[in-house]
Structure formats: C-alpha cells, structure tokens
Amino acid sequence: MSLYLGLDSSTQSLSAILLEVDGKRRRVAFESSIVFDEAFPHYGTSHGVLPDSDPATAASPPLLWVEALDLMMTKLVESGLPLGQLAAVSGSAQQHGSVYLNAGASSALASLDPGRPLVDQIGGIFSRQVSPIWMDSSTGAECRAIAAAVGGDDTLARHTGSRAFERFTGPQIRKFATHEPEAYARTDRIHLVSSFLASLLAGRHAPIDPGDGSGMNLMDLALSTWWDAATSATAPGLRAKLPELAPASSVVGPLASYWQVKHGFPAARVVVWSGDNPCSLIGTGLVREGRLAVSLGTSDTVFGLMQEPRVDTTGTGHVFGSPTGAYMGLTCFKNGSLAREHIRDEFHLSWPEFSRILAATPPGNGGRVFLPWYEPEITPDVPTAGVHRYGLQPGDRDGHVRGVIEAQMLSMAIHSAWMGVAVDTIHATGGASANREILQVMADVFNAEVYQFEVGNSASLGAALRAAEADAESDHAPVSWEEIVHGLADPVATSRIAPNSTAAALYANMRAVYSACEAHALGRGPVPAIGNVAVGMSDD
C-alpha cells in the first residue's frame, strides 16, 4: 500500500488530498483545507489578498503560504494515518503569481532547522515581501512594451501560448524591475507559487513545469524552454534569475530532513508542482482529446486536452502545457454566475422557478438573442459593461431566462472552437452544474453528452494523481493516464444528459446568428438579421 499527497495552494486556502493506493483499490484517505483569513488573521488579508488603495493591484504575503504549508503537514500527522507509506507528494498552485528570493535562499532552504517553525527561518530570504497574484491588472503598460519588443501580440501568442496579459508573470516582473530596480538587482531567483512551495518541501530550488511555465508569457510552448526574446524584453538579466524548466513528472528530490525529523515523514519523492488549471485537467479526468470540462462558477471556464498546440487568434484563449506531456486549451468567461443570478433576481425568481421556465421555453428562444455583459467581459474582449438585446424586450421574463443560458453556452462553444477538439463528452463542474436544465442546453449546443462531475477540489486531486503517475514512472513501471485517473476522476455515471438531435441542429445554425449579434454589439458588423429581417435591439 502506498500513499500519495496532493496539495493545492489557491488564492484563499491550502487544500490537501491523500490517496491510498493498494493495487487496483484506491480511495481518498484524507482531505482537509485551511482558509487563510481564518487561520492566519495576523497577515491582514481579505480572501487571501492584501488590501491596497489601488483596485488594480493584488498581492499576497508569501510567508502566509509558508505558514499554511507547515500547518497542513502537522494536520496530516495528527490524522493518525500510516504516513510511513507516503511514496510521493506533488502540488498545485494559483497560476501566474511570483515569489522573489535573494541569494541567501539556497543555503536557508538547505539548512532548515526542524526545531523551529518554518516561517521563523525564512523571513530573510525574500527580496520582495509581497507576491503579485493572478488578480492583479496593473501592468497594461508592461504588456504593451513586451508585445512590441517581440514583434506584437500575435508573435507572443504563437511562441508562448497567450498574448500579453496583465496577470501573467512576465509583465509583473517587468513592473517590479522598472519600479524597484534595486530590489530587482538583489533578486537571485524568481519562483512561481508552485515552484516556491515545492522548494520548501525539497529543501532546494525546484524547477518549473511546462504547465505553469506557460502562464508566464516567457516560455516557448513548443520547445518547453525559456524564450530568449521574451526574457530579454521583460527585464535585464531575467534568464539567470528563473528556475530551470522540467517535465511535470520530474522528481525534485526527497522530502527535506526538516519534514522527516519534525513530522516523521519518510524520504518521499517530491514531484514538480504545477498550476491549478493543469492539475484540474487531470483531476477532472481530461486525459484524452474529445473531453471538455466546463466549470460553471463565478466565472465560467472551458478547458480540455490538445495533442498539438493551437493558438486562439482572437487573443482571449490560452494554451498551457499539460501534465500528460501534451497541451491544454482554456477560455474564461467573466459573466458566469453573475449574469445568471442577475436574471434570477431581476424577475424575482427562485432557482426552481428559473429552471421550470428554462425547460418550458423552446430551444432557439423564438429568435431572441441576449448578450449578458453585466461586467466587462474577458471572452470576447468587452472593455465596457453593457447588455444587448436582439428581438428581446426588456420585460420578457421567459426570453431572458433562456436567453442568458443560450448566450453563455453559444459563446462557450464559439469561443472554444479554436482548440480544434471534436467534443463527445463534457464534464460539468461548479455550482450551476447541479442544474440539469442548464446542462441540457449545454448538451444541445455542443451536441455532446454532459456528465455532472462531483469533486471537491479537482486541483489537489490532480496533484495527488500526478504524484502517483510520477512515482510509477520513477520506478520504471509507467502507468497510462487513463488507468491513473480511473475510479478517482470519473464523472457521475448516472448523471448523463444526452443532446436532443433537433435542438442540436437548431443551435448549429444559431451560432452564425449569435456571432452576428456579438459582432454588431462590438462595433464590428451590421445590424444582424434573423430570417432576412433585421431584428429590433435594446441596450442597457
């Protein structure tokens, strides 16, 4: 019997899943989460983020993550599980966030004292006391400068998988180097959150895997190497400050003596960590093409495995490395639950009432189209909020209920087509995935079977599964990814929702109508026509 630990350091919490593997029998033996604000109020964070007078700036204290890691390992010991059977540990972390260390970090990591709390030993290793995170949007000027230096956003996207994004690590590094040049000069190593936490476990600088490295605007996606043009355009001497890149199944080394002596852990393998999105790819069982995951949350996200890297020419999608050695595509939509809840509240509905109306309204919504951009949208790029109606009157309750869901599903299908994936199965996650009426529209629009997927933390589960896969590979007994995820990252078999062939055909034709409405709303096309008749419009 072997145990595999998966950790996930998100914006607001640190979660852990411990898998017990005994031949073909596998189960989750331990699951826990530490909410940062509750466990460590002395850092003064709100939802894991430090307060700032600039709403575009978002950062967290890296010592918070250090203290959380030490506490989680203590909780594991207190569980009473046979941790002597721990074979490997890996992790997931919020993507794009960066940690800045000085030249004293290497010796500090290698000489951790098990008699002292971890947080008390490494406070002096930071050249920057805060870590900018994915919520930061303050680097527009840096994005433009980097893109211009490498030949434009199209060139940057072809090489790195994404155009320059404010939250990505490269623009954040450029801002730091420009505004705090002396602190940047004192910086010896710039880690991602994932590689920093892996370094704490291994007691040495850990590499970055291609999955998380591709969220930096710095890595050549096809070669899995740092792209010199991007590193040079970002900051002077940056290449020497970056960790090495290594495959996702690489072993950094054994758990450092700090963990072995203080907590009694064995010399388990520390597997390279990755980002939360690549780990969630594994945790939701997306290990072959043809499957997509749709997360229906505050924001809606579509992601899936791609065997070859393809780039979204509109510049809104992302390509990351996959732990399987292939690639993953991801597209995010900001107006997710916000838009659904807005319609529910505007018409004073309960969720059961919302669902009944949705089920009773015919597919296609009688030609009525609704664009629910209550907030500036990520996909498509809508910088100014505003809703748009085509053939839909403001007081039409039923039309708005179906209109908001059809708009979201059509937008997902249209704006994820760049991935080039022939979809046969969708794993639906997130709060709204409990609504089968919404999932029926999803099945019809994508013309694919939809399954509900019940997993508390797909990122930490994916990290634990990655640890198991890397451990098998290190023992020269590799196991297929299908076998790795089977039984642990499967959707609910009885939740299958099949597409209605008539509705699927209608939505296939409706994509062009929706695209025309979207183009008009964005000022890129004429007033759309449905059945050769220009539709009436109203905007908020």
Give the label of every model feature segment.
Residues 34-36, 247, 499:
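Active-site donor-binding loop signature of nucleotide-sugar glycosyltransferases
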Residues 52, 56-57, 77-132, 162-167, ...:
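Short beta-strand-loop/turn "lid" adjacent to the catalytic site in phosphate-handling enzymes
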Residues 119-125, 141, 235, 302:
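Glycine-rich loop(s) and the adjacent beta-strand/alpha-helix scaffold that form part
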